[in-house]
């Protein structure tokens, strides 16, 4: 029986697009390709009978995909844009390449500024109360994560998060891996690799 359960977040829709159109949309561990101008209209036609995703959801997922650092990195002058079947079309213009570079810089600056703010806010709390100091093995784990390539991540939004979703928490000196365990109206509770439970705002998570 065909699965008609509706998608509930952008991540599911993007994964669906990479499966349906692998020559156009690429998974997070592969380089992205510049998309054809007007790709949304092509998607709307191809997925007209797809009950699991609405046009509104499709537009939101497409926006998240094209605003990811990985995608913005691929928008370079003369790179060929592709359609849903991977056929090359027009080249990326200098104007579009410049806009992508500007958007990428602004996005990175925003994430790193929030990371610094979290570090600054966490410092007094740490001085006042020591909470579950990680063992040496855990410290090594966190240290290893400091070299994580953030180009595949973007700031999370509350509505896109799902239970058991793997995320990165902007906590301390580097993003820390965590799993979403509870979603409330204002906060997101995550479980760190050390087993510690932390409540944060969605703006302190990247996906």
From Swiss-Prot:
Enumerate the UniProt keywords alphabetically. Chaperone, Cytoplasm, RNA-binding
Work out whether the entry's keyword set contains Zinc-finger: no
- What does the record list as GO biological process? post-transcriptional regulation of gene expression
Give the Gene Ontology MF terms in alphabetical order.
RNA strand annealing activity; RNA strand-exchange activity
Question: Taxonomically, which superkingdom?
Answer: Bacteria
Q: What is its main location?
A: cytoplasm
- Pfam families to which the protein is assigned, alphabetical: ProQ (PF04352), ProQ_C (PF17516)
Q: Where in the cell is it found?
A: Cytoplasm
GO CC list: cytosol
Q: Which SUPFAM superfamilies match?
A: FinO-like
UniProt key word RNA-binding? yes
NCBIfam families, A to Z? PRK04950.1
What exactly does this protein do? RNA chaperone with significant RNA binding, RNA strand exchange and RNA duplexing activities.
The family annotation for this protein states: Belongs to the ProQ family.
Protein name, entry field: RNA chaperone ProQ
Q: Which organism is it from?
A: Psychromonas ingrahamii (strain DSM 17664 / CCUG 51855 / 37)
Phylogenetic classification of the source organism = Bacteria, Pseudomonadati, Pseudomonadota, Gammaproteobacteria, Alteromonadales
The gene from which this protein is expressed is proQ
